[in-house]
Amino acid sequence: MMYHIPGVLSPQDVARFREQLEQAEWVDGRVTTGAQGAQVKNNQQVDTRSTLYAALQNEVLNAVNQHALFFAAALPRTLSTPLFNRYQNNETYGFHVDGAVRSHPQNGWMRTDLSATLFLSDPQSYDGGELVVNDTFGQHRVKLPAGDLVLYPSSSLHCVTPVTRGVRVASFMWIQSMIRDDKKRAMLFELDNNIQSLKSRYGESEEILSLLNLYHNLLREWSEI
């Protein structure tokens, strides 16, 4: 399943990020991809050795960790270190699949269950640059407002279409979820959303408490910690 997570960064945060990224050191984006991806990847990424990168990636981690909808949808166990990319002048990233595992600075290795893109450019400021994701439900084309995030299974083939005008800047990362299975994770997310909706409409009740108990028992049964 694919999820749109709005408002991960405020407009003020986005403006500050963009101003700082204007001063960043950018390198060839192929430095962080494997052999298959390198054949179809043509973009730039912020140099991960810079002091600015360390500060910005930490802010992204703080923002997603504090976002309730992101947590409910992803049920994250481990987050990769966020990266930042830039597309301009017809740069693109052809169809590819993300690696199943990635190295992690604290955990050694992590499984990539979910991929996330946090948009940092106003969609009206550039042409092209759509994230295209192929999954079992068909093809999805995504171009979100700056500050919004899209979450989708890392097992999906995906690409970024050529940016023919302007500049597309984004942050991206991978998530190892406590729930490995996409279908089980989607069911828990739907159940959680319905519980929250019922609570806001009717207040606390025995029935809602029973549903909450069911949610946590399923999470206990399916989670890998």
From Swiss-Prot:
Its cofactor is Fe(2+); L-ascorbate. The gene is ybiX. Keywords: Dioxygenase, Iron, Metal-binding, Oxidoreductase, Vitamin C. SMART domains: P4Hc. Its EC number is 1.14.11.-. 2-oxoglutarate binds at R168. Residues 78-177 form the Fe2OG dioxygenase domain. The lineage of its organism: Bacteria, Pseudomonadati, Pseudomonadota, Gammaproteobacteria, Enterobacterales. Binds 1 Fe(2+) ion per subunit. It comes from the Bacteria. SUPFAM superfamilies: Clavaminate synthase-like (SSF51197). It comes from Escherichia coli (strain K12). One of its GO terms (biological process) is DNA damage response. GO terms for molecular function: 2-oxoglutarate-dependent dioxygenase activity; iron ion binding; L-ascorbic acid binding. This is PKHD-type hydroxylase YbiX. Fe cation binds at H96, D98, H158.
